[in-house]
Amino acid sequence: IYKTDTFFYPSQASESSRRAFGEAWPARAREIVTASVDLYLQEHWGSALDAMRCDTHDAAPVSKNLTEKQRQAVKDKFTAVNLAFDLCEKGGQKTWRAPFLETAETLRSAVRDNVCVAYTQFYLRYKDSGFTKKHPEKYIKRSPEEVSLVVEGLFGGRS
C-alpha cells in the first residue's frame, strides 16, 4: 500500500516532476504502481485466486454427479477461499487505510476486478453442484454480494 501510495501522485506527472525526474518518470511511476498492486493481489489473494480458477474452457455449472474425489476437491477450494476472506476480515485488511483516495480506489478496483469477478464465477459454478451433502453453509459462507461489500470497505472505503 505504501509503495502504491508513494508513486501514485508522481505518476500523474506535473511539468515540474518531468523536469526533475526526466520524461520517462511518469511511465516508470505508473509501472511501479501497477507492480505494487499486482504484488498486493498475489500476497493477500493469491491462494484464493488460485483456488477459484476454473477451467476457462468450461465455466458452466458443474453437474450434480460428482465423484467423492471431485466433491472433496471443491470443498478444499471453498476452504482456501474462505480462509483468504477470513484473513481479510479478521487479519486487519479491513482496518488498513490508504491516505489518498485515488490509491484506495486503485486497490479496491484491482480486488473488485480480480477477486470479486473470480468469486462470482466460482460461486455460480459450484453452489448447486451437490459437492456437500450436509451443511453447505460450512463451505459456502458468503454470497457474491457479501464479498463485494467486504471489498468496498477495504482501504478506508465505506464501512
Predicted regions and their residues:
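Extended alpha-helical "rod" scaffolds
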Residues: I1-S159
